[in-house]
Amino acid sequence: MTDPVSRQPTLVIKVGGNELDDATFVKELARIVAAMRPIPTLVHGGGKEIGVLQETLGSAPRFVGGLRYTDATALTAAEMVLCGSVSTRLVAALIVAGADALGISGVDRGLIRVVKQEHPAGDLGRVGRPTAVRSEVLHELLNHDVIPVIAPIALGFDGPYNVNADEAAGAIAAALGADEVVFVTNVPGVLVNGDVMPRLTRHEIEHLIADGTISGGMIPKVRAALTALDAGVRAARITNLEGMLEHGTIIIAEGEVHE
């Protein structure tokens, strides 16, 4: 449900964990985000760093339908990386770039509530599906010009759950009534035969998933984009850092025109 406290233009940015291993990428991301007005909300993943720590803790990473299977060891690794090293790295870069930023997780103040995620490909372990977002927590920060930097560890009835960062970003964008949610990846958009599709609708996305053109980790991104659209977000975009301000693939509802 959209919080009526603020109706200034709202942007949610999700950045993948793999990209955050690159110090140059983090510095440039922080520079761009720090200059944005109104200030955005930032959601981040953990990427390879989670898998490396998980292996160090004695558990081999595995994925089900493009989503990380999360047993107790994997959850510990995700918490340590997402709420620890990655969050600190991003917040530090933003502050150095001149912004005010605060790192929080979906557990803090019960920001993101979840239920166990069911998946047709099999059991995902402690992976959660967002059911509620306390948007007023984010508005409190945004209204004081503080960028929320959100780690996708969320709260279920029986404790913390790992949440796919794309799904978390979509749920947050929906709760904020965001004008746009931007998924920043290592590719310039949704590719079809090597070319970036400038615009896609739900029908086109479902067709591209069915024929295998959209696969792997791109599926949660487009699904999260569609969920956000269903909840009232005007548009979603998938792009890379270079295209973050205006390029990439725009995903829109059927029949809409996004300017």
From Swiss-Prot:
Pfam families: AA_kinase (PF00696). GO terms for biological process: arginine biosynthetic process via ornithine; L-arginine biosynthetic process. InterPro entries: AceGlu_kinase-like_sf (IPR036393), AcgluKinase_fam (IPR004662), ArgB (IPR037528), Asp/Glu/Uridylate_kinase (IPR001048). It is found in: Cytoplasm. One of its GO terms (cellular component) is cytoplasm. Transmembrane segments: none annotated. The keyword ATP-binding applies. The keyword DNA repair does not apply. Substrate binds at G46, G47, R68, N162. It catalyses: N-acetyl-L-glutamate + ATP = N-acetyl-L-glutamyl 5-phosphate + ADP. Its EC number is 2.7.2.8. Keywords: Amino-acid biosynthesis, Arginine biosynthesis, ATP-binding, Cytoplasm, Kinase, Nucleotide-binding, Transferase. The record marks K14, K221 as: Transition state stabilizer. Pathway: Amino-acid biosynthesis; L-arginine biosynthesis; N(2)-acetyl-L-ornithine from L-glutamate: step 2/4. Disulfide bonds: none annotated. It comes from the Bacteria. One of its GO terms (molecular function) is ATP binding. Belongs to the acetylglutamate kinase family. ArgB subfamily. HAMAP family: ArgB. This is Acetylglutamate kinase. It comes from Roseiflexus castenholzii (strain DSM 13941 / HLO8). The lineage of its organism: Bacteria, Bacillati, Chloroflexota, Chloroflexia, Chloroflexales.
